[in-house]
Every structure is written in C-alpha cells, then in structure tokens.
Amino acid sequence: DLAVMDRFCIYMPGWEMPKNSSEYLTNNYGFITDYLAEAFHYQLKHTNRYEEVSTRTKLGKFVEGRDEKGIKKTVAAYLKMLHPHGECSDEEFEEYVAYAIEGRRRVKEQMNKRKPDDEFANIGLSFINTQGEEIVVDCPETMGVEATINPKKPGVNVDVPEEGQSHDP
C-alpha cells in the first residue's frame, strides 16, 4: 500500500551490504550484543539531534512534508550513532544529508512506479550545500533508467529537474 510506503523514512540498499556468513563469526572474545543494544538504546533515547539537523539543513523545492521529516530523522539518527560526542564537520554533515536523501528518493521512486498518476513524480530531491549550491541527489542504481530520467506520466505537467542537475538557487 502506497500510504504505508510513504511513511518509510529511508529505503536502504541491502544489495550493497555483505551477506552474513560464518566468516564474520569468531571463536575469540567478542562484544556482547545485549550490551551494545542497551548502550545504543540509552544513547538514542536520551539524545535529540533533530533540532540541530533542522537548523543546519536546507532542502530543495521538491522536498515535501514527509520527505523533509524522513530526511531529517535519518540524518539525526546518523549523528546520534556516528557522532555521539556532538561534533560533526560540514563535509560529514552534507554527506549524511545526501545519503538520507538518496534513501528517501528510493522510496519516492518505488511509489512513482506503482502510482498511475503523477502524485509522486517529484523525485528530484535536493539540498543546498554550505556554498549555496543546490545538489540533486540521484540513486546510483537508477541513473539512466527511463522511469528516473522522465518520471512524469504522459499528459500530466510536473516540474522535475534533470538527473544529476546541480545549480545555484
């Protein structure tokens, strides 16, 4: 159902992750996962990075309500896990924003493929970097695919930026 799918913040590329196998297991001492899970639970529950993300992030014009919320929640989660001490450079932050947008774009592309009209055709999600340039984030696996190049349905008018487009706002 598209209504449920639209509520996903990110669609992670599982095909880019290594398959779990016995070579990742050890016979030596290891980190107990219960302890790690409890540490992450405490860290994630008692730290709020959403406000920081909201003030540092400038998103493009095709980013709509659920897109914005999903992108910001994903970036806040990255900051909690990767920078629990609180410091993050602008380059790192922009990388996290780009990856969050890429994941959200995957959700939008899948919804656009399943919907007969142009409700989800605005897949050109972007952000404004620290130099003031608008960066449209593409998914590597769909670059050059007709449904991504031209997400509009015939006969419906939707303003969509060109694939890979970057320009000053």
Give names to the regions the model predicted.
Residues 1-169:
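C-terminal regulatory/interaction module of P-loop NTP-utilizing enzymes
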